[in-house]
Amino acid sequence: MRPPWCPLYTPSLAAPILLLLLFLLGGGAEAEDPELLVTVRGGQLRGVRLMAPGGPVSAFLGIPFAEPPVGPRRFLPPEPKRPWPGVLDATAFQSVCYQYVDTLYPGFEGTEMWNPNRELSEDCLYLNVWTPYPRPASPTPVLVWIYGGGFYSGASSLDVYDGRFLAQAEGTVLVSMNYRVGAFGFLALPGSREAPGNVGLLDQRLALQWVQDNVATFGGDPMSVTLFGESAGAASVGMHLLSPPSRGLFHRAVLQSGAPNGPWATVGVGEARRRATLLARLVGCPPGGAGGNDTELVACLRTRPAQDLVDHEWHVLPQESVFRFSFVPVVDGDFLSDTPEALINAGDFHGLQVLVGVVKDEGSYFLVYGAPGFSKDNESLISRAQFLAGVRVGVPQASDLAAEAVVLHYTDWLNPEDPARLREAMSDVVGDHNVVCPVAQLAGRLAAQGARVYAYIFEHRASTLSWPLWMGVPHGYEIEFIFGLPLEPSLNYTAEERIFAQRLMRYWANFARTGDPNDPRDPKVPQWPPYTAGAQQYVSLDLRPLEVRRGLRAQACAFWNRFLPKLLSATDTLDEAERQWKAEFHRWSSYMVHWKNQFDHYSKQDRCSDL
């Protein structure tokens, strides 16, 4: 019997009607939606409409911005993507750049959330655009995200970087890009054309150029681009600030938990070459052994499977360490004309607007990756001996005297053996040395040289966090709030966290709009003051109202940024004096031995008889 609600049903009409319904309800309807069809310089794109809690957004995912850097293009600067025929499907993320995958805690959410969620490939130079639906009638500010991951990992497709929430809630255009990491992005044989180094940074720059050329098509304003990133992404943002060819491609900058002057962020040309040639040797290049030139070495490296390079890249580090990474940007005299410290000190930053900040416990995340006595599966109550050994891996370049100074500064001398205090001290050593104090130093220098700077410390531990309580608020765990993930009900954040995320998104969007995180429409709320070299004001970000403080870990950063460099300089002088003294003593000893031998020889000769 025919259902009463289907009077026209016949077998001959069933299939066409079903296809028509699928077309109207599925991809066909979106294919005809003018909001989801755009034309960029490379050709046409078809995007997808996604739902956020507040409404829909348009997403254009997996847009190629460079030719695939495969085969003979491995290690070379990127080439702009050539035009394509027809309409390119941009409804799903593309491959993740080849990289190391973290297997320390298999299946654990705290590590898996940072692992690649798409297929690994060297064909990976794609970007993504989220824009309000419908597109803004007038040009809207653009936020461009650079992911972190120690320059050895990361992907723009990770769930934590989902741009739909920020684009919908704040009406901004959000862009993210993949860039090459590890040896593929940062292996360098300085002076060679085959592997010049810093090609991962050049990938980012090419994506920024793509934004300038195309973002207006999506409703974005190419004259109001804010570059933001976290950890190695923040260091990358800083390097673009310091590299003149990049400076004209964006207008404001946000550096979250990273800075270009961090001790892990760059290497010199000599160390870069040492690491490159060591990796080559580890994978059997050049085939004839030592003595080959750069061209032969790179030609050989290009024949090696990508996974071979990944499997060996950690073996090139000069010593056991935490918060050090194998292939990072090189001070090449080109992208970086000098060290970041020198460029920061010499730069003119008048008119620049910068937002910088850190989280409460920057060091804790890294301790489970090599500091003695630390694990996510226990309380990590370490002994004094483990703390002393931890300082050597936490500050791997330190001389004996410098390491003693670190121990002296971070020991609670009323409780020098207390395991909980030692655990906290070890976290502070790694966090202050690598993140907090480089960020504070950068903020002070930029402010002193004309930039308008805002600074924060993020202090809220998410209710959903899977890492143990002793780790506090770890590195990277402000990102989910900046991107608005607590707005998604299925993720089970609290109501207070949803409000907090909305507040943070508003701060970041306000900064992208005006260069000031404060909301001019609501002057009654606590104001976020600029950071100056004198007052050093910053704010704490947590569930409570904004709190203004002064001096971001000022005592610790005076140690790292002022005292320790002077100590190292003095000990370098002492070491050189000792070397010269030993050399002189050796020459004097040799002379005395020679003199004694001559004297003994003379003494054994027959003496003249008395006349």
From Swiss-Prot:
It is an enzyme of class 3 (hydrolase). It is found in: Synapse; Secreted; Cell membrane. It is a peripheral membrane protein. GO terms for biological process: acetylcholine catabolic process; choline metabolic process. GO terms for molecular function: acetylcholinesterase activity. It holds the Pfam family COesterase. GO terms for cellular component: extracellular space; plasma membrane; side of membrane; synapse. Terminates signal transduction at the neuromuscular junction by rapid hydrolysis of the acetylcholine released into the synaptic cleft. Belongs to the type-B carboxylesterase/lipase family. This is Acetylcholinesterase. The lineage of its organism: Eukaryota, Metazoa, Chordata, Craniata, Vertebrata.
